[in-house]
């Protein structure tokens, strides 16, 4: 995803919103996770990889998520050449148990940008984080922009549904940024 694609994605989300509103008006209550989930969420909702979920792979090893296993299995763990190639992406095995170094660093409360963000439907993908920022707990610009485009589209949907007489959850406030890093305060 590149910044110049943001407008196209925004238009696609607006088109989906129009379809959703028309379906609501016809008596249906469709769900489209990237737009409707945010209407009901009150906190961050992602996969919880490495924190509340762990992957046990066919090789008997534990991984923070399946993507790390497939990185190792396919030998692509260093595609972006950020650091020395390592085929060991596991965080333990059935014999030795789970051994996540610094597990607190995978938690939301240790992610300065994410813990104050309200793009609750963000993927916050630790595999992508590691690939693009070298840090499991810091999302890339691309992830933040996508999440905020979807968040803002969910806000637009919420306003359209309310205008049509439907209940649409707690108000999603208007913001004027797509990447929280651009408006961050010192941590």
Residue map of PLM features:
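C-terminal accessory region of radical SAM enzymes
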Residues: 8-39, 67-124, 132
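Conserved acidic functional residues
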Residues: 53, 66
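Short, acidic, Ser/Thr-enriched surface-loop or helix-capping motifs
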Residues: 56-57
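Radical SAM/AdoMet-radical enzyme domain recognition
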Residues: 1-3
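Short catalytic-site patches enriched in acidic/histidine residues
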Residues: 38-46
């Amino acid at each position: 995803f590149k910044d110049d694609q943001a407008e196209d994605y925004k238009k696609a989300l607006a088109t989906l919103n129009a379809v959703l509103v028309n379906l609501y008006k016809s008596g249906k209550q469709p769900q489209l996770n990237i737009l409707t989930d945010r209407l009901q969420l009150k906190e961050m909702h992602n996969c919880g990889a490495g924190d509340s979920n762990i992957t046990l792979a066919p090789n008997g090893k534990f991984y923070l998520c399946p993507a790390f296993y497939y990185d190792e299995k396919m030998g692509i763990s260093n595609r972006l050449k950020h650091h020395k190639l390592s085929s060991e992406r596991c965080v333990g095995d059935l014999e030795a148990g789970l051994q996540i170094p610094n597990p607190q660093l995978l938690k939301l409360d240790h992610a300065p940008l994410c813990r104050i963000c309200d793009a609750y439907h963000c993927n916050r993908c630790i595999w992508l984080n590691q690939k693009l920022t070298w840090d499991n707990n810091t999302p890339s610009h691309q992830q933040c922009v996508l999440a905020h485009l979807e968040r803002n589209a969910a806000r637009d949907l919420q306003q359209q549904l309310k205008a049509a007489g439907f209940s649409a959850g707690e108000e999603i406030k208007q913001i004027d940024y797509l990447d929280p890093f651009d408006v961050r305060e010192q941590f």
